[in-house]
Amino acid sequence: MLRRLLVLVVAIFATIVSTANATSDDSTNKRELKYVFPFSKIPVTYSRDHIDYPATDVHGCYAHVLAPTSGIIFDVEKKDKWDEKIDAPGTRGGLTITLHGDDRVRYFFSHLGRVKVNAGNRVEPGQWIGVMGSSGNARITKCHTHLGMSRICPQSEYKVLQGEIWPWRFLDAWRKGINKSPVQAKNRVIKTSPQACELAAAQD
């Protein structure tokens, strides 16, 4: 009964957030936000595919991780809680940063070696926020940073948080200095699966 009530509350809040997303997108369109390539100091490479959902793994150990646009740091994890024997999905990212962009897009960086910001911090495009590393299950794979981009949900539902639009298209543009916004791609995903936040919350 309590779980059903929780899901209902999350569903209602998700509807409010979706409306806020649309309203905020309208106001955001009136002022162009700046985007930058979010890795520096070390040359990085990244693929154009991912396991079974849209995301990008970026390789270039110890590269500086930068804020791709302006926004608020919503959440950080500064302790690597991943245990290989348990392999809990919510801990696989190790050290993480979740940025709620002013564009109403959520940017999730995981497997970091160092986190340089705190929840609630305001960041600007190109600000140094972390360092690429091998925390979480990257301890048994390879040093890299996972970048997931998604809509903003009421909470950090892991399934949506890890990614729902392809970052590489935007990384390609930002690397060339092209100010390409992911807002339209995010909005298309919301129209296709409007209940994704609450469905993910029910699975957590």
Predicted regions, residues:
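Bacterial N-terminal signal peptides
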Residues: L8-I16
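Short peripheral tails and domain-boundary helices/loops at the edges of structured domains
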Residues: G148-I178
